[in-house]
Regions:
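Surface-exposed, low-hydrophobicity beta-strand/loop segments enriched in small/polar/acidic residues
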Residues: 1-125
Length: 125
């Protein structure tokens, strides 16, 4: 089952925003940022989504711009010994969706501009 989490972003006068919320667990499958039609986050805004307990960075996107976008984030995988898993033909890393182990997530915005707004959608399944 896929869960849709909606985060309404509203920066303060210094361009910052932060909120923390629980997640039951799953994988971060996709995210989408939609700017407000009249007061979008600044072009140089940074979005971070981090595990509140582990500090694991699920999203770290800088200078997001002022148009809507969607991403399907993936993390590099490794074998049981910790060596990078690579595709044999190309040597490119094998990637997979990051697992969220039932911890709280913190969404932070930096450099967002004075009292700017937008919406971040997270699909976790």
């Amino acid at each position: 089952m896929v869960q849709l989490i909606t985060v309404e972003i509203a920066t303060n006068s210094s361009g910052a925003f932060s909120t923390t919320f629980p997640v039951n667990g799953g994988r971060l499958m996709q995210y989408r940022y939609v700017p407000d039609g009249t007061a979008p986050l600044a072009t140089g805004a940074d979005i971070d989504v981090v595990g509140a307990t582990t500090g694991f960075a699920y999203i770290n996107q800088d200078n997001i711009g002022t148009t809507a976008f969607s991403k399907l984030p993936r993390q590099a995988t490794s074998d049981e010994a910790g060596a990078a898993s690579l595709y044999a033909g190309s040597g490119e890393p094998v990637e997979d969706a990051a697992v969220i182990g039932g911890e709280q997530l913190t969404v932070s915005i930096a450099e967002g501009g004075d009292t700017k707004v937008g919406t971040l959608y997270l699909w976790i399944g």
